[in-house]
Amino acid sequence: MEAQHLHAKPHAEGEWSTGFCDCFSDCKNCCITFWCPCITFGQVAEIVDRGSTSCGTAGALYALIAVVTGCACIYSCFYRGKMRAQYNIKGDDCTDCLKHFCCELCSLTQQYRELKHRGYDMSLGWAGNVERQQNQGGVAMGAPVFQGGMTR
């Protein structure tokens, strides 16, 4: 699927739309991330990778890295950098790694909230969001009407 950009709510250019420690502003995601961070990571990775990585694959790889090394934050901090680059959010790789190392859950929930704030329905995945956007565009715009029929 080709890359689509959803309409985002306005916020300061170059800034995260929510704070790093605003985990409880979305209690459902906060609980899911606390008990199973691989789910939140998988959802974020699928959107950031624009569907080239599935939620299940990214989440399973995250869980495997966490079980084998205990350092899944190394994997997830790359996605924070990738997301910052896509949305022109201020920051640097060193700070990304520090945030993921010191508070992985806060980092993951902030990324999740950012994508949600930018118009993504995280439960739909990339393909579902693209389809939703196309359906909304199709309904709002409607089919063009031609007057006069065919002529030579």
Curated annotation (Swiss-Prot):
Organism: Arabidopsis thaliana
Single GO biological process annotation from the record: response to oxidative stress
Similarity section: Belongs to the cornifelin family.
Intracellular or extracellular location(s): Cell membrane
Expression triggers: Constitutively expressed. Up-regulated in the shoots by cadmium. Down-regulated under zinc deficiency.
UniProt protein name: Protein PLANT CADMIUM RESISTANCE 2
Role, per record: Zinc transporter acting in both zinc extrusion and long-distance zinc transport. Involved in the loading of zinc into the xyleme and in the detoxification of excess zinc at the epidermal cells. Acts independently from the zinc transporters HMA2 and HMA4. May be also involved in cadmium resistance.
NCBIfam families: A_thal_Cys_rich
Observed effect of gene inactivation: Strongly impaired growth in the presence of heavy metals such as zinc, cadmium, copper or iron.
Pfam families in UniProt: PLAC8
